[in-house]
């Protein structure tokens, strides 16, 4: 059978199921694919195939995740489901799966539990814009008041973590009922997908953001000038445009792009995702180096202080064997750059144990081009000991 071409006609959205252990996240994921498969919009995936999640490595951290994809009438979704709570924490903090929105599953029989709260908090900290609630196991609750109570608790919890608790769609259903083909519960899965289509916003495309390219390598071509190579992170750069070089003391030096090359071919422009070489006018080879970024003038600022949400690897994951304390100074690997920084722990936190997820303040030894949402690894002696993302810039 010929390989299917990736259909670009529908907008693409990344979502996932989050929530407390045994509330039915994986059953719901299987139910979504089963119900949509009947409408020809998905490939059927069994509970077991999703539950036996393969290991993946992202920024040196091993995470178990299952990826499924499906379509609705309006969108193409890539959906992530993780078997264990620790996998969720790692997944959301390291960005192995960037979520544009999430379905939070809560069992009507239990109501919100500690991990329900923890996942909502994590979603807030890593800037997941909106959540949709699926109240599961409603076929096991006869009391309407009990359902209303759980719904009220969920709305309060969402509002507490600065989501729109009043307007967030809450769908009452039964994932197992839908998986077993009960029409009443299949309809609820379709209702859930409609809620995702309308409530979860389309993510801004990388190509529509300002141009930015981290420099990976630099070389000079005799008679033509200096070429900087790298993968364009966001935006578009055209031949003849003015750009700025930032970071590592480049002090915002400006230049003009006189050529864009990809695979030894000349292009008129490079766009997000392309690996290119940019020919820069009037820039000496020693004025630009790996770790700097090239961008449109005035679009990116340098910062040396920020707050971040981080996950610290366990010993079994190749991380530290011992905790670290306040003022710990590891290297931060940001884009293509290793830079030393000092960690300040939250008030009242004496130390951080391997396996912890914590909010820290970081002060780098020199400013680096960075923005909220940017992900990084924490390294010590060349090995990854943690990963995280910037949640707030300070200077």
From Swiss-Prot:
EC number(s) recorded for this UniProt protein: 3.6.5.3
Name of the gene this protein is made from: tuf
Full protein name: Elongation factor Tu
Positions that bind Mg(2+): 26
Annotated organism of origin: Parabacteroides distasonis (strain ATCC 8503 / DSM 20701 / CIP 104284 / JCM 5825 / NCTC 11152)
Family membership noted in the UniProt record: Belongs to the TRAFAC class translation factor GTPase superfamily. Classic translation factor GTPase family. EF-Tu/EF-1A subfamily.
Keyword set, alphabetical order: Cytoplasm, Elongation factor, GTP-binding, Hydrolase, Magnesium, Metal-binding, Nucleotide-binding, Protein biosynthesis
Binding site for GTP: 19-26, 81-85, 136-139
Function recorded in the entry: GTP hydrolase that promotes the GTP-dependent binding of aminoacyl-tRNA to the A-site of ribosomes during protein biosynthesis.
Region (G5) location: 174-176
Annotated segments matching region G4: 136-139
């Amino acid at each position: 059978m010929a390989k299917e071409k990736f259909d670009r006609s529908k907008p693409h959205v990344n979502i996932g199921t989050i929530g407390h252990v045994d509330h039915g996240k994986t059953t719901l994921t299987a139910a979504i694919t089963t119900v949509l498969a009947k409408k020809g919009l998905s490939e059927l995936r069994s509970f077991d195939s999703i539950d036996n999640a393969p290991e993946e490595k992202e920024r040196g951290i091993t995470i178990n995740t299952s990826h499924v994809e499906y379509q609705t009438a309006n969108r193409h979704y890539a959906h992530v489901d993780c078997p264990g709570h620790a996998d969720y924490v790692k997944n959301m903090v390291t960005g192995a799966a960037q979520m544009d929105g999430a379905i939070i599953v809560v069992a009507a029989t239990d109501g919100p539990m500690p991990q329900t709260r923890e996942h909502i908090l994590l979603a807030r900290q890593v800037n997941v814009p909106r959540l949709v609630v699926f109240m599961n196991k409603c076929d096991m609750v006869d009391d309407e008041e009990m359902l209303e109570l759980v719904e009220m608790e969920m709305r309060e919890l969402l509002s507490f973590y600065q989501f729109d608790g009043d307007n967030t769609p809450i769908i009452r259903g039964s994932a197992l009922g839908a998986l077993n083909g009960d029409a009443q519960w299949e309809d609820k899965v379709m209702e859930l997908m409609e809620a995702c289509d309308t409530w979860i916003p389309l993510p801004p495309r990388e190509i529509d953001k300002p141009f930015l390219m981290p420099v990976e390598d630099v070389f000079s071509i005799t008679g033509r000038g200096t070429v900087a190579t790298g993968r364009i992170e966001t935006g578009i750069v055209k031949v003849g445009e003015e750009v700025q070089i930032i970071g590592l003391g480049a002090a915002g030096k400006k230049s003009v792009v006189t050529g864009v090359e990809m695979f030894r071919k000349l292009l008129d422009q490079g766009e997000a995702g392309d690996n290119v070489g940019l020919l820069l006018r009037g820039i000496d080879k020693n004025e630009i180096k790996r770790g700097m970024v090239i961008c449109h003038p005035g679009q990116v600022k340098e910062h040396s202080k920020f707050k971040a949400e981080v996950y610290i690897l366990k010993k079994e994951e190749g991380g530290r064997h011992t905790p670290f304390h306040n003022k710990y100074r590891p290297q931060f690997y940001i884009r293509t750059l290793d830079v030393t920084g000092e960690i300040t722990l939250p008030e009242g936190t004496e130390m951080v144990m391997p396996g912890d997820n914590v909010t820290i303040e970081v002060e780098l030894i020199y400013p680096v081009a960075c923005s909220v949402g940017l992900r990084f690894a924490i390294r010590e002696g060349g090995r990854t000991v943690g990963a995280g993302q910037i949640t707030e810039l300070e200077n």
